[in-house]
Amino acid sequence: MRRADGRTDEERERHATIGFRTAGPLLAGLVAFALAGALLGWAVMYGVMFLKLMIVDMPSYQCGGSDCPRGMMPASLLAAVFGGGFFVLARLGAHSSGKLLPVGGACGAFLCGALAGLWPGWLALAWLVGPHMDVAWEVGPDRPSSARVLGYWESGPATVVRVRTDGLYAYNTAQGDARWSASAPDRARVCALSRTARSGTGLVGLERQGAPCGSSVAAVDLESGRFLWQRDNALAENATGYDITGVASTHATAVVVEKLGTLVGLGLRDGSERWRVDAPPDCGVSALGASGDRVLAVLECSGESSTGETAWLWAVDATSGSSDWRSPLPTSGPVSAAHILSADPIVVYAAGQDPWGTSGVTVFDADGSRRTVIPIAGPDEDLAFTAFTEGPGPQSMPAFQAVVSGELFISVVNDTKSDRPRGVSAYALADGRRVWHTTFDDGIDMLAPGRDGELTVVTSRWFDQLWRLDARSGTREQKAVVLDGVSLSPLFAVRPTANGGYLFVNLHEDSDEAALFAVD
């Protein structure tokens, strides 16, 4: 029986069966070609990332295991798997659809699959290699080549001042633009600087021909770069360029050292003398620090006392110059190095020359009583928190890889004989016990304060990485950020910026790297 369209029921059923038999292979071919397109896109994407990690992030072209740039080995394996999957699915699509699918349809399905797979493929790749930061701006290397960097100050949230032997240079931390520069006075060079800049004022020690470092002291306004005052400073006859003048400041008082043993308090903004106080006989000042209304000085005494102590911590009132207290440092002999790591709370590092002396970090109460001593060489690990520039000439500001946060002293530590420490530990200021410890796979280049309650740790092996740690627990806040395209000198400082990035200041004296740069 024929229907209105002229076909019988048998003919209609036969045509329907043919349609179903054709649609199945056609749909399978379209899906196979679309998946093949996605896999080819992923293979190219992961292959390019593998080449980038191998060529750019691994200059020696060889690595093994955890030494390899993060994500490199998985990227290479996945690129091969995706490439193989592409060939399998492309052949499957051609076999399934046969001649039913025109070339244009196959190409369209292939292209749609490739485009649809780009975004999820990129998200997976980004997770695999982890977060990255790129250089937002940089300031070129120091010129002239004779200039040597000594240290830096922060002036508010938007200005960093880099101190060199030939002068001071201020930069806007948002774009890296130069704000001002101040050349060293005629026939003089800068040779020392205060570790902190109070009330927008920095102190520098000057060296003139035939006179040692610290023969003059000057104050600089960090908003304008103007020298506020300059003062000749009397030094001992045997002073050398390594007897760095102590320069420190509270909010209203500048403190300098005369003749290696006399503290002089000056008006921070006008340089007028307000007080002076002599150290005990046969004692000289080897380190200076200040905070609030107190000045702290490390004394080294040549005449051995009745109790055998030769090194002391001396506290002086910053307003009147009166001596508050004097407490012995546990070195039991000559001191090879001493630094005031924190003036509030009081944390002092002192290393003894004699093997029977104690080298460690000493914590004092506000009244000068010794609270605890954290040994440099402990039963489980060694503190490894100082980094100095090398070579002759004036001494640069040491970069301390240690942070005092709340009631914790946090330091880079080394529990092996390797030259590259890989651990960070926190010790309680109350009793010196270790509160937490964390270990990294790569060597640690810098530990510094981060954002509120955080620490910043920079590590490197094949590439540079930045980590964020919770200062209270040592917990890592996130996966490490890979620093792309950065040029770090052997000695540098790092601090967070307001826009969520980080500012790096290179401080090595013989460096061709950028003077400073920001990443975001």
Regions found by a protein language model. Name each.
Residues 99-129:
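Internal/C-terminal transmembrane anchor helices
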